[in-house]
Each structure stands twice: as C-alpha cells, then as structure tokens.
C-alpha cells in the first residue's frame, strides 16, 4: 500500500475495524490525521482525508437518480438491455459503487470487485450505512462487496452471470481542474494493477450474456474489439458486447 497512508481512530470509531484494517495493510494507527492521506474511523463511519479534503462514500446522494421514474433513463440501465427475474451482474471495477448501485436499483444482484483496500473500506462503510437507510436498504441488500483483484475473481467465478460491467477509466487521466473532491483524493492512491486487456479477457472467459464497457467518448474500443452496439452520452459512451 501507499506508504503515505495512515489510519486514525477518532471519537466513536470502531477500534476493532480500524485495527483490522491497519494490521491487514501494514499501516500505523495514529491519534491524529497524518501529513498525507488518512483513513479515518470515527462516529460517522470511515472517510478518507488529506490535502485539505475529506471524502466519505454515500449513496444517499444518488436517490434522485433512481426515484420518480428517472432510473430507466440512466444510460447504464439502457445499455444493459436485459429484463427478467433473479438477474446477476458483476461490477469488476467497483470504485465507490455508484454504477453497481444503479444496476442494483434496476433489480440486479450485484457483486462488486474492488482491489484497492482504502476504496474497499470506504465502499464497505457506505454499504453498511445504506443498509440502515429506509429507502436505500432494499437496493443495498442486493449489493455484495468482494475485496480482491478483479481478474483473479473472474477467473474463479463458478456461477453464471448475466452482465459484467467494466469501467477501466482512471481519474488521473482527467485535468485536475475538472475533477471533484472524491477523485482528487482517490487519484492519489495507487492505481489499479490490472491492465484493460486482462480485465476484458477475464470478463469474456467468465461467459456472461453481456459485457458493458464504459469508455471516454472519443477513445478507441477496448482492445480494439468492436462492440455489438454503443450508447453515447456527452462525455462518455457504453460499448456493449452481446456474447
């Protein structure tokens, strides 16, 4: 892990959780935030602080996207084009889980893979709080986090899956003036190790009905493979592969 990361146990924080994270990732526990990035465990949950910024995962801010008839208009929901019962999806590049949340809101049982331990800790805490929310709890109950390398996880996959979603875009590609607080902090973490081609190959071998890949609008297709169909937005597009 990034050697500039520390753990801080604040007032009301869960000591056992903080100690487990610190031990697992070989980072020190401090009584105050470090000079660079700090994973803070306090009464509010888990947050990432540093460089004058603080970020905590929160699905409550996405309620407006999944209520009042807005969900069917989401590009990702339109891209999956699958209907039925007991549908299963894998978000192989979970990040903070926003896209997985949209799929879960649409009815999918979603498994989220995240290999960065800091991001996984933030996402785990966001899911914990969402499962206590009167509206979010139903959606969050369909989301399961798996911490680990996505390629390895997909190679070990035994159960059939309907959709595998890939978002290999990494925040550092964006100009610093255009990125929000979350990305400013997350881009300071170590980038993911898995190459785009390795992710795509593992997704294909897993045998889903569809693979959905999020791409910058003007970028080339992942690994040069032409999609079955494309959904375009103003800044991004979804390349959709029917298997």
Residues of each region from the PLM?
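S-adenosyl-L-methionine
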Residues: 1-89, 105, 113-163
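Residues at the starts of beta-strands that form the adenosine-phosphate
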Residues: 88, 109, 142, 209-210
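Conserved beta-strand/loop positions that form the S-adenosyl-L-methionine
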Residues: 92
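Conserved SAM-binding loop of SAM-dependent methyltransferases across substrates and taxa
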Residues: 96-108
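A short, acidic, amphipathic alpha-helical segment used as a generic capping/interface helix at domain edges
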Residues: 149-153, 191-204
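Mobile active-site "lid"/loop adjacent to the S-adenosyl-L-methionine
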Residues: 168-199
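Conserved Class I SAM-dependent methyltransferase catalytic core
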Residues: 196-242
């Amino acid at each position: 892990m990034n050697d500039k990361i520390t753990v801080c146990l604040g007032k009301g924080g869960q000591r056992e959780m903080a100690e487990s994270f610190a031990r697992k990732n070989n980072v020190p526990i401090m009584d105050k935030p470090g000079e660079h990035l700090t994973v803070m465990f306090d009464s509010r949950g888990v947050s990432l602080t540093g460089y004058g910024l603080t970020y905590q995962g929160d699905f409550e801010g996405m309620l407006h996207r999944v209520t009042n008839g807005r969900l069917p208009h989401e590009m990702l929901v339109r891209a999956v084009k699958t209907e039925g019962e007991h549908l299963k999806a894998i978000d192989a590049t979970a990040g903070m889980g926003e896209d997985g949340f949209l799929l879960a809101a649409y009815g999918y049982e979603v498994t989220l893979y995240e290999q960065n331990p800091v991001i996984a800790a933030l996402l785990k805490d966001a899911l914990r709080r969402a499962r206590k929310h009167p509206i979010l709890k139903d959606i969050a109950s369909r989301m399961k986090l798996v911490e680990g390398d996505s390629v390895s996880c997909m190679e070990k996959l035994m159960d059939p899956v309907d959709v595998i979603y890939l978002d290999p875009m990494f925040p550092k590609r964006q100009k610093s003036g255009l990125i929000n607080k979350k990305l400013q902090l997350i881009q300071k973490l170590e980038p993911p190790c898995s190459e785009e081609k390795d992710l795509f190959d593992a997704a294909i071998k897993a045998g889903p009905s569809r693979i959905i890949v999020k791409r910058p609008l003007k970028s080339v297709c992942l690994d040069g493979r032409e999609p079955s169909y494309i959904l375009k937005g103003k800044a991004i597009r979804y390349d959709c592969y029917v298997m």
